[in-house]
UniProtKB/Swiss-Prot annotation:
Keywords: Ribonucleoprotein, Ribosomal protein, RNA-binding, rRNA-binding
Task performed by this protein: Forms part of the ribosomal stalk, playing a central role in the interaction of the ribosome with GTP-bound translation factors.
PROSITE patterns referenced in this protein's UniProt entry, alphabetically: RIBOSOMAL_L10
Name used for this protein in its record: Large ribosomal subunit protein uL10
Entry keyword annotation includes Ribosomal protein: yes
Similarity field: Belongs to the universal ribosomal protein uL10 family.
Subunit annotation: Part of the ribosomal stalk of the 50S ribosomal subunit. The N-terminus interacts with L11 and the large rRNA to form the base of the stalk. The C-terminus forms an elongated spine to which L12 dimers bind in a sequential fashion forming a multimeric L10(L12)X complex.
Family annotation (CDD domains): Ribosomal_L10
Organism: Marinomonas sp. (strain MWYL1)
MF terms (GO), sorted A to Z: large ribosomal subunit rRNA binding; structural constituent of ribosome
Length: 166
């Protein structure tokens, strides 16, 4: 279906607006994936706070101009699905990596984070980033471990001094 100029401008504006506020982006090729699988992917993306859109390459290039994701422009070749993470940098990478495992025809082309182009083979760099809550939990466990070790050391010193005094 041919898109009119106004429709194209609206798509570019929408994708550009999302790109300006997104934390990371993933570009993939969804050629050969069934409609029901894509519908399921879109549903999971909404739940994960990930914006997913199939966009024409020229429109995608225009949409990412002047954003951190301009480095992705060369990966807009062939059918292009672009996913932006809005809440957590690794959300889109994690979602599309899991989807690619169950759909052999789905292929991740490239990723971008902080203006850096990341090859598809390095998807784990983003996919394994802990969420904010996970990072806080890890930090708290490290602090708690260090604190409890310090308290045990103080108790041992106290017990040792009590034994020497007795």
């Amino acid at each position: 279906m041919a898109l009119g100029l106004e429709d194209k401008k609206a798509i570019v504006a929408e994708v550009s607006e999302v790109a300006k506020t997104a934390l990371s982006a993933v570009v993939a090729d969804s050629r050969g994936v069934t409609v029901s699988s894509m519908t399921e992917l879109r549903k999971e993306a909404r739940e994960a706070g990930v914006y997913v859109r199939v966009v024409r390459n020229t429109l995608a290039r225009r949409a990412v101009e002047g954003t951190d994701f301009e480095c992705l422009a060369e990966s807009f070749v062939g059918p292009t699905l672009i996913a932006f993470s809005n809440e957590h940098p690794g959300a889109a990478a994690r979602l599309l990596k899991a989807f690619a495992k169950t759909n052999s025809k789905f292929e991740v082309k490239a990723l971008a984070f902080n203006g850096e182009l990341i090859p598809a083979g390095d998807i784990d760099r983003l996919a394994t980033l802990p969420t904010y809550d996970e990072a806080i939990a890890k930090l708290m466990s490290v602090i708690q471990g260090a604190t409890s070790k310090f308290v045990r050391t103080l108790a041992a010193v106290r017990d040792q001094k009590e034994q020497e005094a007795a």
